[in-house]
UniProtKB/Swiss-Prot annotation:
Domain Lipoyl-binding stretches: 24-106
HAMAP family in alphabetical order: GcvH (MF_00272)
Family to which this protein belongs: Belongs to the GcvH family.
Naturally occurring in which organism (per UniProt): Synechococcus sp. (strain RCC307)
Annotated cofactor note: Binds 1 lipoyl cofactor covalently.
Keyword Nuclease: no
Assembly and interaction partners: The glycine cleavage system is composed of four proteins: P, T, L and H.
Protein name as it appears in the record: Glycine cleavage system H protein
Cellular component per GO, a single term: cytosol
Keyword Signal assigned: no
Needed co-factor(s): (R)-lipoate
Organism taxonomic ancestry: Bacteria, Bacillati, Cyanobacteriota, Cyanophyceae, Synechococcales
InterPro entries: 2-oxoA_DH_lipoyl-BS, Biotin_lipoyl, GCV_H, GCV_H/Fam206, GCV_H_sub, Single_hybrid_motif
TM region positions: none
Gene3D superfamilies: 2.40.50.100
Amino acid sequence: MALTFPAELRYADSHEYAGPSDEGIKVGISAFAVDQLGDIVFVELPEVGASIEKGSSFGTVESVKAVEEMYAPVSGTVVAANQAVIDTPELLQNDPYQEGWLLKITPADPSQMEQLMDATSYSAKVEGGS
């Protein structure tokens, strides 16, 4: 999979992304994170209605290599969790930005998006190895 970072998304240091969706903000993990994890076998996500806080763990992703926590790029209330990814974790691996999104949230403070990196900055970060 080519490591792509869509320009309409914003990225956290911890490799999660946030971007516009028809239900608020779509949250997932970047192609870089997916590439580092390898074969994904399990995804745990919060329930609809849960509150998540920026920088706090909101779930885990398990691969054949490791179990990693995922951290909220922005604070808000979960309005959708991608059941398809829970049922078929390979969707996350094959298409992290479209079919493999994780959550849709109503943001508590939309200005938190401005604190995240744009695609150019994020690409430079991961290609620089930091």
